[in-house]
Structure formats: structure tokens, C-alpha cells
């Protein structure tokens, strides 16, 4: 991992909960990442999660069935339109969802907000998210990092998922890493195989350090 430098500050209960936005194309592994983060962090932090789908609450259902968090701590939002609108241009539906969840769980440390699947131009409004994690997958081809777009170049952390599929799709992980560094500069990235939990600890370490959750 191209990791961020540790912070000497620490988030306390006097500060609002950390809001972590998770975006990326359909099928890249956003929901899987959210599930793994919740399961790994729920014993140390008070967590709630909000998922976005266009016409259903399928991701909410998947997280509930997987036991990521208690059902009442997962809220599904039906955006009814273009996914990026609900997290950027008009984030009101998600801001309202955050307010509702925090009214139920005022001691929450982290609010995870998963966007609906979208293209490389999707970004979170700073009103909605303090940290943004953007997930792409190797199956999309090794060229994805060099295509750019705000998700690739501006997210706080880029996750390159499904590294185990690289031999099957002819993707060179070294090329993807090199292109990622060219496109992102000093911004960190992590390569993951979420199904095998590979790289999850690096994502958690990033959230804790960048989100001022640890010394």
C-alpha cells in the first residue's frame, strides 16, 4: 500500500462522526468492501451504514443478510435516478438519511455511505463525505487507472479490487500500479482481493489514520 503518514491528532466524541463515502462502478466490490469493513471494525467503533440503489434496496438487503451490522443500523436509499446526483449535485436524500441515522444512533463514530454503481466521473459532495474511497476492479482491464476521472484521481483512497482475477483477464498488476501512481501522485491506493480479505487491513488503517480515529 502507498500509505498516508500517521496523524498525531485523534477524533473524539466531541467531533461529529466520520463520514466515509464508498463509490465505484457497478460490480467493482463496493458492497463487499463495506461488509468487510463493518465486520472488522464493529467491535471497536459504533458504526452505521447507508446504501444507495436506483430502484431497490438490494445492497441494504445483502449487508443485512451477511450480518455486517444489525438490521436497524443499515439504511437503504432509493435514489430513483442517476447515482452520482444523489451523492454530489443534490445530496439532500443522503444528507437526510445521515441525519435520521444519527438521530437513532447519536454516539456513532463512523457513517459509511455507499453510492450506487456509477462511472469514473462520480464523486461525493464534501457536505456528505469527509473521506472518499473509490473502488475499481481488475476485471475491468489494466487500462482503467489511466482513464482518469475524479474517482481515480481525486478520491482520498483508491481501491483496486479482484487482484486474483488478473491472470484470467490478462491484466498486469505492475502496470496498474504504475499507472495509478502517475494518475494519483502522492494519493494512496490499495490493491485488494476482498473475498480473501487481502488488503482490508490496509483500508482500515487508512480510515483510522486519515479519519483521526487513532493516535
Curated annotation (Swiss-Prot):
InterPro entries hit by this protein: CobW/HypB/UreG_nucleotide-bd (IPR003495), P-loop_NTPase (IPR027417), UreG (IPR004400)
Residues binding GTP: 24-31
Principal location class: cytoplasm
Highest taxon above the source species: Bacteria
Cellular component, GO, one term: cytoplasm
Stretches for region Disordered: 1-21
Keywords of this entry: Chaperone, Cytoplasm, GTP-binding, Nickel insertion, Nucleotide-binding
SUPFAM superfamilies per record: P-loop containing nucleoside triphosphate hydrolases
Subunit-structure text: Homodimer. UreD, UreF and UreG form a complex that acts as a GTP-hydrolysis-dependent molecular chaperone, activating the urease apoprotein by helping to assemble the nickel containing metallocenter of UreC. The UreE protein probably delivers the nickel.
HAMAP family for the chain: UreG (MF_01389)
Protein name: Urease accessory protein UreG
Organism: Burkholderia lata (strain ATCC 17760 / DSM 23089 / LMG 22485 / NCIMB 9086 / R18194 / 383)
Upper lineage: Bacteria, Pseudomonadati, Pseudomonadota, Betaproteobacteria, Burkholderiales
Amino acid at each position: 500500500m502507498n500509505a498516508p503518514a500517521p496523524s498525531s491528532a485523534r477524533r473524539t466524541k466531541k467531533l461529529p462522526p466520520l463520514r466515509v463515502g464508498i463509490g465505484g462502478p457497478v460490480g467493482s466490490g463496493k458492497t463487499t468492501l463495506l461488509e468487510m469493513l463493518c465486520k472488522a471494525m464493529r467491535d471497536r467503533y459504533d458504526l452505521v451504514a447507508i446504501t444507495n440503489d436506483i430502484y431497490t434496496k438490494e445492497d441494504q438487503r445483502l449487508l443485512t443478510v451477511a450480518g455486517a451490522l444489525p438490521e436497524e443500523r443499515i439504511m437503504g436509499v432509493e435514489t430513483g435516478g442517476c447515482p452520482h446526483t444523489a451523492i454530489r449535485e443534490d445530496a439532500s436524500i443522503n444528507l437526510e438519511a445521515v441525519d435520521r441515522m444519527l438521530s437513532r444512533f447519536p454516539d456513532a463514530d463512523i457513517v459509511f455511505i455507499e453510492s450506487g454503481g456509477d462511472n469514473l466521473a462520480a464523486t461525493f459532495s464534501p457536505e456528505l463525505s469527509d473521506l472518499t474511497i473509490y473502488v475499481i476492479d481488475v476485471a475491468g482491464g489494466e487500462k482503467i487507472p489511466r482513464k482518469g476521472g475524479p474517482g481515480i484521481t481525486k478520491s482520498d483512497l483508491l481501491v483496486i479490487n479482484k487482484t486474483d482475477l488478473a491472470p484470467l483477464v490478462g491484466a498486469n498488476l505492475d502496470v496498474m500500479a504504475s499507472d495509478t501512481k502517475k494518475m494519483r501522485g502522492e494519493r494512496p491506493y490499495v490493491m485488494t482481493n476482498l473475498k480473501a480479505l487481502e488488503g482490508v487491513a490496509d483500508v482500515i488503517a487508512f480510515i483510522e489514520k486519515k479519519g483521526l480515529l487513532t493516535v
